[in-house]
Amino acid sequence: MINPILYLVFSLLFPSHDFQITHTSLHYNSDLESIEITMKVSIEDLERSLEINNSEKLKIGTIKEKKSAHKVITNYFNNHLRIFTNDKLSQFRWVGKEIDDNLHDIYLYFEIPNCNQNGEIKSLTLENTIFLETGLNQSNIVLVEFKDSNFNLTFTKDQDIQKIQLGK
């Protein structure tokens, strides 16, 4: 039988949930020739991942949130959700964030502006390593909406890069 005090100590020292899932949608806006990115992630998982790379707590979604939070978040996602249009790495810019009504999740909004400079996007390659440094059972689900086509992709530690052919 497990000692209840020992169990409590380990639960407090190593809090986690059994599995982690992020949801990302990429929507191609043909009028603006941009890719709009919406991510839904756990605030707890985001804080944990950011603390690995950043020494200070950002206190995301609280009144004590650090002013640098959006820069740190953008940097993290530019490094852990790498999007290549026609095999060229794209950088995305911060649009905003909002806390979900459940107070557990956060929606993050980014954009890749002017991503169709050569006239046609023929392929998208995604490298998604979001929270893989912290979550043993991490899955990252991505929905890509490109013109009339939809693609559902799942990324894990064993499969973190996928390519979609878009050109006809």
PLM region spans:
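N-terminal soluble domains immediately following signal/targeting peptides that reside
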Residues: 16-168
